[in-house]
Every structure is written in structure tokens, then in C-alpha cells.
Amino acid sequence: MLVGYARVSTEGQSLNRQIDMLVDYGLDKRNIYQEKISGTKLRRDQLDKMIEELQEGDTVIITDLTRISRSTKDLLNIIDRIKEKGASIKSLKDTWLDTSGDNPYNSFLLTVMSGLSQLERDLISQRTKEGLRSAKARGRNGGRPSKRNDKADTVGLLYREGYKIVDIVKQTELSRATVYRILKDLNLK
């Protein structure tokens, strides 16, 4: 069975052009899942419902790649989910995307896209690690600043003077857990 997916990014946009293309291709309008949501959103209810309802041998038809995904990684994940159901996907505009047959050219392009996606993830990871090392070398450890820096001495002083934890919490406006953590760091608890 042919199953269609049409998506626009905002409520103000119309799905009519995509639906017309899918119907012209031979889809029954009742088999077209429609969505008005940004492609960058990972949770797309109609897309998820369509994939869930796919049967072995079904083919998902889209007008073009940007309607189903905004990133290579997301596209590859969606294609994998469709293939796991025993179905295939075909794009009307991006004719290289057709997993319904054993076309070596299409398989090659998907493999290249997968490799590029992995390369992108690896480069991001490498840049992140380099940035963290560079920041550490400049004396920056990352994370949010500790509240302890401002009020640790006050907490220690009040505790040594016999104040109860509840009173220290009120005076310093720190949480109970933070007060206990400071006392532990100061070897007072």
C-alpha cells in the first residue's frame, strides 16, 4: 500500500500543494498523514503514528526530503524505522531516495549520508573535547558557579557557633542539601 506524509512548518502554511502531488502520484487522500509542525521537532505525532501503522511491503511517499526531516541524522533514523517495519520510502523530488528496490546507487548514497552523519558527530565531539581542554588550561572548569563560594564561610561560622541547620538555611537562603554539602566539604558533618 502507498502511504503519504505531508508536513508544513507552521499553522499558516498550506498542505494543499503536497497533498495534490501525492494524490497525482496515486495515493488515496485517506492514506496521507498530515502535520503542521516544525521539522526540527523530534516528536511529530503523525509521523510516529504513520510509522507505527506501517505494514510489511508498504511504501511511504513524500514530496521531498525537507518535509520529513531537517537533518541527515534524523532522516537516517526515520529511514531505519521505516525499514524495520518492512516498508520502504520514496521521495518524488529527490529521486535518488527510493529504498523500495535493490538499486546500488540509492544504497551507496544512503551509505555516504550515514558516513557523513557519523563524521559530523565525531567532529562535534572532537571540537567539544578540544574546547573543554582549552578552557581547563585557562583555569575554567565549566559548569555553573558554586553557591558555596559566597556563603560557605558563613555556613561554617554559624554551625560552629551552634546554630541549628534550619536556622542556617533561613539566614543564608541556601537549600538544606546545600548547607549539608558545605558542612561536609568543611569536614564539619
UniProtKB/Swiss-Prot annotation:
Segment forming the signal sequence: none
Residue ranges of the region described as Disordered: 130-151
tRNA processing found in the keyword field: no
Domain Resolvase/invertase-type recombinase catalytic as annotated: residue spans: 1-139
SMART domains: Resolvase
Domain of life: Bacteria
Catalytic residues in the record: S9
InterPro entries reported in the protein's UniProt record: Homeodomain-like_sf (IPR009057), Recombinase_CS (IPR006118), Resolv_N (IPR006119), Resolvase-like_N_sf (IPR036162), Resolvase_HTH_dom (IPR006120), SSR_resolvase (IPR050639)
Annotated keywords: DNA integration, DNA recombination, DNA-binding, Plasmid
Statement: the UniProt record of this protein carries the keyword DNA-binding: yes
Molecular-function GO term, any one: DNA binding
GO BP terms in the entry: DNA integration
Pfam families documented for this protein: HTH_7, Resolvase
DNA bind region: 165-184
Physiological role: A likely role for the res protein would be to stabilize pCP13 by reducing the number of plasmid multimers resulting from homologous recombination.
Family, as annotated: Belongs to the site-specific recombinase resolvase family.
Record protein name field: Resolvase
Originating gene: res
